[in-house]
Each structure stands twice: as structure tokens, then as C-alpha cells.
Amino acid sequence: MESRAAVDDAALGREAWSVLDANSTGAATVPAPGLYPHQWNWDSTFVAIGLARWDTRRAGTELLSLLAGQWHTGMVPHIVFQPAREEVYFPGPAVWRSTEHRAAPHGVCTSGLTQPPLQALALWWVWRHAADRDTAVALVRRIYPMLVAQHDYLATSRDLGGGGLAAIVHPWESGMDDSPVWDAPLEALPPVRHAYRREEPSPWHPDSHHDRYMALVLGYRDSGYDPAYLRDEHPFAVEDPMFNGIWLASCQALVELAPVAGADAGPHREAVERIRAALLDRLWADGVFRARDLRAGRLSSIRTVGSFGPLLDQGLPADKIAELVGTLESASFMGAAGYPVPSCEIRAPQFDRSCYWRGPSWVNTNWLLRRAAAVHGLVGLVRVLGSQTLRLVRQAGFRECFDPFDGSGRGSRDFSWSAALTLDLLADTVEC
């Protein structure tokens, strides 16, 4: 097992800043050197969250650089490409062809997919913690209309099931790319073969689905990124509890931000109620939230870290909170992992301690669950998740993810959201 000498909080903070400075392009922060040379949606948003207590302007610049890629439909893309390195990553701009679409932003190359709509929660976090209040208020007023457009897009173009939830149309949109939850929807696709640039498959990813990933990309692209195609023909459509839990939390953030922007909070309150009711009606089963495969018409049998996303809801019924926390703290998740929270139920046959989103623990989902615990006044759980996450990065550095049993690092080194969220955790504030 790889480990390093213990570091104190001050040294850990300096290391985190060094990672973020090294990964900065000036306006944006790439996830990690080498493998991820562009700006990823929720990576960049977590960076803004981590910067919020320390540098209001830089956090705002991070969000604005991502939103420069927003489409006229309101969709915020999952990748904004850096012009100097467009062909370094596959699939790059030549595959997505966003510049050929009239709804895409002018002069910016992006993907055609989105990721969890965390931006409103991040903006609220920046506004809440800003030392520079004038800058924070100006930022809210500038970004708020963009977030309203984003949420309108999700409510209209992505309610593919007609029940009030947003559907993802590709595993990449979940942010949890290789989760076993996507296995069944992917395996239902017809066999397909596309040339994949990687000569040697990554040991961290299951390689069997990459051709299907590309088939989904090309089908959506060739439709002209048509929302009617997504509704009627696209073969992958899943209502994910983490995606929708984040959407609900961002709607709650917009309730707080609307008055700052001089807007009416009423529509956001209505959205909160609508999404909450839909989550409980459509995704709750056997004590947890489960992803719904819209094409197969069934719920996933697999419990993952995504099952706990709706815990971010301040208004979740008390009995559901108790059941979710009981499962989270059980031997299926935190109770049997020395370094929580594993991304897949430990007892599931699909669990793999080394494979992305099929077992390893992640700083970003730990942060989200810590935030969820704080929302519900679960001080003990807040402290455990905070201390155990800092233990991971102290021991293994700012890795992409971590073995849930021994804490060893997995994936990329010098990973930006791991560094940024460490800065937030080092503030050591239990916010309930």
C-alpha cells in the first residue's frame, strides 16, 4: 500500500493550493494533469465550492468559465474544451461537432452532454461564505439567469419519463461514469464496434462498455442534439437519484439566491416540491432511492453512493432520512469500510475496490454526503465524514479516488476536486 509521511493542516492546505495552481489555466481548473486536459463540469464546480471560503473572485471565475460553454437551450455541457489542447483528449471537438449546432455557444467548443446541476448550490456556497460581499452579490446577479435557464432546460428537455425528474442520456452525465447501475441499460443496447483511441484499456475502467458509450454519443450528435430524439428514440434514459438529488438541492439554493438577484423565489419553491414528490414516487424502493431505467421500465437492484443523493433535500421526510442513514452507516457501506464512503455496496457482486465508481471512495461524494448530514443536523456523521476524508488525503495525497479498505490512492494524482474540497474541509466547521 502506498502511503506518505503525515502532514499537519497547514502543510496539507499549502499542498492543496499548489495542486490547484498547477492545474489552473487562468480562468478554469482542469481535473488533473495529463489524462484530463480540459474543463469538466462538476469537477470545476467542486473546485468553486472548495475555493468559496478562501477566494471569492477565483471561485466566481471558475463558475463563469464553465458557464461560458452554456448552450442557448440552457444546457451546461459536461466538457468545455481548451483550444490549445483540443485533440489531446478523445472524444474531442471533432467528435462532438458542437460548433455546427446553432444552439451551441459561439467560439467555444463543448461536448453535447451535461452533468449534475451542482452550479446553483456552488453559487450559494460562494455567496454564503464570501468575505467580499459586494463581489458575491454581483456574481449572484450575473449568474442567476444562467442557472434559471439551466433548470428550465432540465425541466423541459430532460423530463423524458414525464414524471417530473430529469433523465440522463449517457453514463457520463451522471459524473459516476462506470457505476454498475449503468450495466443493464448499456447491455440492452445492440452490439456495436467503434474505434476507441486508447490502445491499452485503463485498469481503472471496465472496458467492455466503451463502444456503447461512443454509440450513444454519435446517435445523439447525429440527431442534431434533438430533444425529440432523446424522448422518442435514444436507447439510454435513466432517472438517477444523485443527479436529481443535486438538482433539488440546487433548486433550494435558488430559493435563497433569487432575492439577492431581485427575482421571485416562488418558482424555485414549486420546483423543490415537484422534484421531491417525484423522487419519492418514482425512485424510492426498499429503503433507498434507486435509479429508474426508463427504457426497461424498472428500478435498479443495485445500491450505490448515488442512492443517497436525495439526502441533500432539507425537506426529506424524517422516516426516509432514518432509513437512508441506517443503510449508509451499515456494513453495506460505511460500516465495513475503513475509508468511507464506497461508491458501490460492498456486498454487491459488482463491487470492485479498484474500479472507478464500482467500489472506491471519492472526496466529492464524501463532501456531498457530509453536506447532506449537515442539512439534517447529524453532527456525528458530519464529523466522521470530514475526518475520514481528510485522513484519506493526508495518507495518500490528492488522488482521484481511494481504496475503501486500505485508503490507498487510485487513478490520477494531483486531482483538483480532492485538493479543493480539502480546503473546504480544513475550515472544520460543522454547519447544521
Write out the residue ranges for each language-model feature.
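Long, repeat-rich segments with strong aromatic
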Residues: 236-275, 355, 360-381
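Extended, well-ordered alpha-helical scaffold segments
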Residues: 8-16, 55-68, 133-155, 250, ...
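TPR repeat positional signature
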Residues: 44, 48, 116, 120-123, ...
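Hydrophobic/aromatic-rich effector regions of fungal transcription factors
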Residues: 100-114, 118-132, 368-372
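Alpha-helical support elements that line or immediately flank enzyme active sites
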Residues: 44-74, 306-316, 366-379, 386-389
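Internal, well-ordered domain-core segments that constitute the primary functional module
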Residues: 115-180
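Extended glycan-interaction surfaces of carbohydrate-active proteins
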Residues: 2-39, 66-106, 164-239, 274-360, ...
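Core register positions within helices of long alpha-helical scaffolds
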Residues: 50, 122-125, 129, 250-253, ...
